[in-house]
From Swiss-Prot:
One of its GO terms (cellular component) is small ribosomal subunit. Keywords: Ribonucleoprotein, Ribosomal protein, RNA-binding, rRNA-binding. Belongs to the universal ribosomal protein uS19 family. HAMAP family: Ribosomal_uS19 (MF_00531). The lineage of its organism: Bacteria, Pseudomonadati, Pseudomonadota, Gammaproteobacteria, Pseudomonadales. GO terms for biological process: ribosomal small subunit assembly; translation. Protein S19 forms a complex with S13 that binds strongly to the 16S ribosomal RNA. It comes from Pseudomonas fluorescens (strain SBW25). One of its GO terms (molecular function) is structural constituent of ribosome. This is Small ribosomal subunit protein uS19. It comes from the Bacteria.
Length: 91
């Protein structure tokens, strides 16, 4: 269920401050964050944000199509290695 429009987008304040500082300095280093629940705002376009996936920080280059989505959508948390082949079925 989407968030109510009257509430506005959610973004953690510490992440918003980091984004503003990085935008002022035109810093190319990734902004490291653990806030997967924060929504991508237009101010973030062009920045690289390192989103934590539970094990490491995944660099996400934000473009215009990502605005309105959550940061966690672009850093998967589960590793899929494929189904193990059944040796009897192959014979």
């Amino acid at each position: 269920m989407p968030r109510s429009l009257k509430k506005g987008p959610f973004i953690d304040l510490h992440l918003l401050k980091k984004i503003e500082v990085a935008a002022e300095k035109n810093d190319r280093k990734p902004v490291k964050t653990w806030s997967r629940r924060s929504m991508i705002l237009p101010q973030m376009v062009g920045l690289t944000i390192a989103v934590h996936n539970g094990r490491l920080h995944v660099p996400v280059l934000v473009n215009e199509d990502m605005v309105g989505h959550k940061l966690g959508e672009f850093a998967g948390t589960r590793t899929y290695r494929g189904h193990v082949a059944d040796k009897k079925a192959k014979r």
